[in-house]
């Protein structure tokens, strides 16, 4: 009798919520294809990036920003204008290609950050030596 009452109380209290809880916040990882370690002035390097989500929520939005702290160069998405350092740009796909063009005769280093609209953020660092 006690077991039946316990089961009934668990069943009835578990159905108190009217709304179904849907997980929206899924962590993600960035996968980057290998890039050359050396670049010469004026050379463009393709950087292939994939956002790998641990779950799927259709309303998840992703953005990218970057900052170059050594050397000089530009980073752009496809045929768009070069990104401005620390400005945020929306990403429309989970797989994308960035193009870094060296404008320096010394070593170059920069970081990119990809964020979602739930506060998750991943950083990837790149470093290129000068190629004569």
Task: Enumerate the predicted regions with their spans.
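Bacterial N-terminal signal peptides that target proteins for export
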Residues: 1-2
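First exposed extracellular module after export/assembly in secreted or surface-exposed proteins
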Residues: 24-132
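Bacterial Sec-dependent N-terminal signal peptides
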Residues: 8-32
């Amino acid at each position: 009798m006690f077991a039946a009452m316990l089961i009934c109380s668990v069943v009835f209290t578990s159905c108190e919520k009217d709304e179904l809880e849907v997980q929206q916040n899924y962590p993600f990882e960035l996968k980057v294809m290998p890039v050359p370690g050396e670049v010469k002035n004026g050379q463009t390097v393709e950087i292939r990036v994939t956002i790998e989500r641990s779950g799927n929520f259709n309303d998840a939005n992703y953005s990218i920003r970057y900052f170059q702290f050594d050397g000089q160069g530009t980073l752009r998405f496809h045929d768009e204008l070069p990104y401005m350092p620390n400005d945020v740009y929306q990403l429309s796909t989970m797989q994308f290609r960035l193009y870094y063009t060296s404008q320096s005769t010394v070593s170059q280093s920069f970081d990119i950050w990809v964020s979602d609209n739930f506060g998750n953020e991943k950083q990837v660092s790149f470093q290129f030596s000068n190629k004569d």
